[in-house]
Each structure stands twice: as C-alpha cells, then as structure tokens.
C-alpha cells in the first residue's frame, strides 16, 4: 500500500505549515497565554476560516472542502507541531461532527455554514462531574414541556466551552443515569440567561469551561437527531475527536524529538556534544521508533474513525490511543531527562509540548480505559 501524501495533500500541508509559522510562532503563543480576554487568537481563527481549514470535513454544499479523513489528519499533525491554541477540535471536529451526523438539513445549513465562515463556534457538553470517560453517564435531564424542553444539569470540562456560541448538550429524556438509552442532544445558546459557565485554562493553556443549566428552555427545533437515541452519535463524535487528538499528538511528539536531537548536537559536556554518547543515541532512536509507531496507528484510526461499523471503529481508535499515550509519556520523559532542568522551564518550548501531550493522554479516555475497550472487543471477536 502507498501511504505517501498526494501532491495536493503535500501542498496543503506546506501551506498550513507556513500559515502557522507566520501567525502562531512561540512569541505569539506566549502573548495568547498571557492575555485575559480570551484563550486563543480571534485573528488566527479568522485566518483559519479564510484558509478553508474550518470546512475540511464538510460537504461542499455547505461551503465546505469535502476533504477526507487524511486531510483532517494532516491538519491536526500541523496543529500539533505548532501548538495551535484555537478551538478547532471543539468546534470543527466535535461540534461539527455532531451536527453532520445527527442534524437535519435545516440545522446543518444554520450551523455548519456560519461555522465554516468563522462566524460561529460550537462546543460539545458531554462530560459531567461523575462521568469521567463514560459519556453515557448523564444526570442532566431534559423534560418535555409543550413544544419545548426544560434542561437542568451540570457539565464538566467542556473543551472550547469558554468561547462557544452554541453548546451541543447531552441530556437524559428517559432512563437511568448510566443507561446508554434515553439520551438526547440539544443545541443550546451559550449566552442564554439560564446558562452559566466558568471558563478556565487547561494545564496546556487551552480553554475549557464548567457549564450549569438551570431549567433552560429549548424549542423542539433545537433537538439534534432523534429523541432518546443520541448515544451512537455521542460515541461516534468522541471517536472522531480521539482520532484527531492522536494525530495532533504525533505532530507534537515529532517536535519534541527534533528539539531533543538538536539539543544533543549542540550541548557539550566533557569536551564534546552529548549526542556523541552512545546511550543517548540509543534513547533517541527509541523515541523516533515510538513516534513512527504512533503515526501508523493514528493513520489507521483516522481512516476508520468515520466508519459506521462500531467494532472496527472502536478497535482502531482504542489501539491508536493506547500507543499514542504510551509513546507520548515515554518521549516526554526522555526528552526532559536528556535536556535536564531547562526541559521543564516555562520559557523553553519543550515544556509546552509536554504539557499538551499530558492533556491529550487524559482526554477522551486514558490508557486503562482504551485497553479495557480494546480487550473487550478482542475477546468478543
């Protein structure tokens, strides 16, 4: 099989790299991290829209690019290499996928088109304080009241919730708390009076929010998909997000490797570069191998993440997440060890990549969660 990018994909990757190098340099990221009025650059977000990045996974009739899963992976790898702070995962990958998979034609037109234009941001409010990685564990309730629903509950660690215009909220319309049946999705105006939130930065500097809904009134027109049957959509959206995170981690790991290799070539001890010591050469090779293995499984996850066969999708995504988490931990620790104290300073770029890789490992299921899911699928096969 040929895994090389096409000419168009190489051009896309090069163009995106140049955009991020010009608009998202380390000094620019530092300014974003220090600013108090928002956790990302609105100017760069509009650059993404002008570039066509926000429309990659969407149909051309909505103004999208009609791109493939590999096109999304290429973009995510570049985001990982440049530590992009923008809510691409939250709005395009997660929110956009929920609308694409469950929305009516009117809902798609109303939400996807302005999102592609950079005029609207989405965020998925699936997690709750007690749910951890099990997004079917939902206590938030939606009660039917005439032609509308009243939603009450709390949502935790809503990625991109700090800047979202609309929230896609999971709520239980029937069934017990941890039941996969009886879940529904609703499009909720994030600025509604009965919606309150506390925005904050994750440890890598990206924005998230805790969200509380107090008897929020939502019309039936804002029900996304079929009432009581939202779990397959939530599960699929989460797999797409996990695959995207795996690709982003590959890009981040590549920069950690390159930064460490350059340091080994320039840092001198005992009269010669420390990269001349064989034990460090072997460790560097191990880091490169881990990154390559992660990239291979991330590619498989990207290709299978949009499949309707749940078992195939779960197996590919979980395998990738396990390998990426293990590789990210090994590469982060080895990179810091070979750098010494400078590797954990706030000003040096390596530490910023390590923080991002730590957040990736904890998002949408850690190693134990995905090992358990992969093991159950293997046993059932």
PLM feature spans:
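Alpha-helical interface subdomain recognition
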Residues: 1-83, 102-105, 114, 118-119, ...
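N-terminal glycine-rich flavin-associated loop
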Residues: 86-106
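Short beta-strand-to-turn element immediately C-terminal to the catalytic PLP-Schiff-base lysine
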Residues: 101-103, 143, 169-172, 187-189, ...
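A short, Trp-centered hydrophobic/proline-enriched beta-strand micro-motif
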Residues: 118-127, 169
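Flexible, small-/acidic-enriched active-site or ligand-binding loops
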Residues: 133, 137-139, 188-220
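Cytochrome P450 C-terminal beta-domain/meander region
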Residues: 134-152
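A short core secondary-structure module
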Residues: 148, 152-196
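A short, charged helix-loop
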Residues: 209-237
């Amino acid at each position: 099989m040929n895994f090389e990018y096409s000419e168009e994909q190489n051009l896309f990757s090069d163009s995106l790299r140049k955009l991020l190098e010009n608009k998202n340099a380390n000094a620019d990221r530092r300014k974003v991290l220090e600013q108090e009025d928002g956790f990302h650059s609105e100017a760069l977000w509009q650059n993404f829209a002008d570039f066509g990045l926000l429309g990659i996974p969407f149909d051309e009739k909505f103004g999208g690019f009609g791109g493939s899963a590999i096109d999304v992976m290429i973009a995510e790898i570049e985001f990982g290499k440049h530590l992009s702070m923008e809510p691409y995962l939250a709005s395009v990958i997660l929110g956009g996928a929920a609308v694409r998979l469950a929305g009516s034609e009117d809902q798609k037109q109303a939400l996807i088109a302005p999102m592609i234009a950079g005029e609207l941001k989405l965020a998925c409010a699936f997690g709750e304080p007690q749910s951890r990685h099990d997004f079917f564990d939902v206590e938030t309730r939606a009660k039917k009241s005439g032609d509308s629903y009243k939603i009450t509950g709390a949502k935790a660690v809503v990625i991109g919730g700090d800047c979202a215009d609309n929230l896609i909220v999971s709520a239980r319309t029937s069934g017990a708390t941890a039941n996969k049946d009886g879940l529904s999705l609703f499009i909720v105006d994030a600025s509604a009076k009965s919606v309150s939130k506390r925005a904050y930065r994750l440890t890598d500097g990206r924005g998230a929010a805790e969200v509380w809904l107090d008897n929020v009134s939502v019309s039936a027109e804002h029900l996304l998909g079929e009432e009581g049957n939202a779990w397959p959509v939530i599960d699929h959206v989460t797999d797409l997000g996990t695959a995207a995170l795996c690709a982003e981690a590959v890009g981040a790991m590549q920069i950690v490797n390159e930064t460490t290799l350059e340091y080994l070539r320039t840092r001198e001890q005992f009269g010669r570069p420390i990269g001349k010591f064989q034990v460090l050469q072997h460790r560097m090779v191990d880091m490169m191998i881990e990154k390559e293995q992660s990239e291979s499984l991330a590619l498989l996850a990207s290709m299978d993440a949009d499949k309707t066969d749940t078992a195939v999708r779960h197996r590919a995504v979980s395998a990738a997440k396990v390998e990426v988490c293990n590789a990210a931990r090994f590469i982060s620790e080895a990179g810091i060890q070979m750098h010494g104290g400078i590797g954990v300073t706030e000003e040096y770029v390596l530490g910023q990549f390590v923080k991002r890789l730590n957040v990736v490992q904890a998002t949408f299921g850690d190693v134990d969660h995905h090992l358990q899911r992969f093991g159950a699928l293997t046993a059932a096969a």
